[in-house]
Amino acid sequence: MGLLLLVLILTPLLAAYRHPDFPLLEKAQQLLQSTGSPYSTNCWLCTSSSTETPGTAYPASPREWTSIEAELHISYQWDPNLKGLMTPANSLLSTVKQDFPDIRQKPPIFGPIFTNINLMGKAPICVTAKRKNGTNVGTLPSTVCNVTFTVDPNQQTYQTYTHNQFRHQPRFPKPPNITFPQGTLLDKSTQFCQGRPSSCRTRNFWFRPADYNQCLQIPNLSSPAEWVLLDQTRNSLFWENKTKGANQSQTPCIQVLAGMTIATSYLGISPVSEFFGTSLTPLFHFHISTCLKTQGAFYICGQSIHQCLPTNWTGTCTIGYVTPDIFIAPGNLSLPIPIYGNSQLPRARRAIHFIPLLAGLGILAGTGTGIAGITKASFTYSQLSKEIAKNIDTMAKTLTTVQEQIDSLAAVVLQNRRGLDMLTAAQGGICLALDEKCCFWVNQSGKVQDNIRQLLNQASSLRERATQGWLNWEGTWKWFSWVLPFIGPLVSLLLLLLFGPCLLNLITQFVSSRLQAIKLQTNGAGCRPRNIQESPF
């Protein structure tokens, strides 16, 4: 009876417990089921704890290149020779700001998020930029790219204004040029490159085409029914299904290819009027970086993973998804239970043949060439990558908080320094008055320290749970998964032992009563006198 109560108490608690890897494993199981993999049931799903290879990259399909949305981050820099021209330059900048509300957004966090990432499969599209003095983000080998677009390394884009054109919206006179191997693309006359309806015309006016241009079909990424088309006017990719009508899905405001090429460009605002003269020296420069707006998608550049590409980036990149290493083992294998404790104790290693998740899916062959048959699998796979993106966002918020606090405190310190210099102007400033070196002390905010303290507490909690032996929940869950199949039969046997004697006694009494009743009926029939009258002849 005590064991039954223990099972009834622990079962809801253990059912509510969720291992930290459960979201990823659940998404992996959904992915296996959606692709009809033979490993969707009766198998082991294992995650790797190795830090040498933090994950695997999976390239996006050609159709996803037409649907994943990008965004631009704009900052500007004044020309150092603006002495005496700040007033008209500010007037011009205020006009531009009204037409471009994204100016001076909070800059994204650049740099590789992960390194030593392995790209599985062949990327359908890659983009190469070779800029002088550019920021190298990583380079994919040409052998893993099906089609490679190269951004013109020598192009510089300028925007010229007259005094009467200040009220007009700025845009690129021409898009950044991209080149590709001769004979790679085919001219196609189609209605899809004339421009689809877009809800962001007034916001992203730099992408308005100056005139209509025919599309170029990418043959080795297309099929007879589905085309992948390139519009060189806007550096945009379109997907067209020839078996359907013209009213197909709209494309994003800023596509990945457009954002990647724009981020390699240079834009300067150069007013030309009787006030400024005819010089084409830009008054200020725009620095444009690009990020992927679709959560879970990343730039894959060599073995590095990026959320954003900086201004004037250089390298060879594609887009795709990232997941931690998840392996599959057949369900008939007996896996050893990991034991937490002294990590220095030797552990016996068993030769277990693990299958990578992507190999178990059987969809790698279709990513680099075709565009059909993997839509559902790719969508489910992207959910795995979103789990990583959420963790990255959390780290990014902490780093952003650090940057904001440093900027805020630096402004306060500089303001106080100016005030002290004014009070001690007669002595030549505070530094000369004290006859000391000018030093600054920036006191870090407690908000940042609280975030770091929480991270440390979480890490400490994980270490404690890993060293508590079999009493910790994580270890309990691991051995409980082995015991779980035996709980049902054990509970059934326990119930049988508890209520079996009672049931047996009831059955015995019922049988005895029925036998007694039959016996009484038989005895009564034998003692009754016969009432038979003989008929006379």
UniProtKB/Swiss-Prot annotation:
Residues 500-537 are cytoplasmic. Disulfide bonds join C43-C46, C43-C439, C431-C438. Residues 354-374 are annotated as: Fusion peptide. Glycans are attached at N133, N146, N177, N220, N241, N247, N312, N332, N443. It holds the Pfam family TLV_coat. GO terms for biological process: syncytium formation; syncytium formation by plasma membrane fusion. Residues 16-478 are extracellular. A motif (CXXC) lies at residues 43-46. GO terms for cellular component: plasma membrane. The chain crosses the membrane at residues 479-499. It is found in: Virion. Specific enzymatic cleavages in vivo yield the mature SU and TM proteins. The record marks R350, A351 as: Cleavage. This endogenous retroviral envelope protein has retained its original fusogenic properties and participates in trophoblast fusion and the formation of a syncytium during placenta morphogenesis. The interaction with MFSD2A is apparently important for this process. Endogenous envelope proteins may have kept, lost or modified their original function during evolution but this one can still make pseudotypes with MLV, HIV-1 or SIV-1 virions and confer infectivity. Retroviral envelope proteins mediate receptor recognition and membrane fusion during early infection. The surface protein mediates receptor recognition, while the transmembrane protein anchors the envelope heterodimer to the viral membrane through one transmembrane domain. The other hydrophobic domain, called fusion peptide, mediates fusion of the viral membrane with the target cell membrane. Belongs to the gamma type-C retroviral envelope protein family. HERV class-I FRD env subfamily. The surface and transmembrane proteins form a heterodimer. They are attached by non-covalent interactions or by a labile interchain disulfide bond. The CKS-17 immunosuppressive domain is present in many retroviral envelope proteins. As a synthetic peptide, it inhibits immune function in vitro and in vivo. This is Syncytin-2.
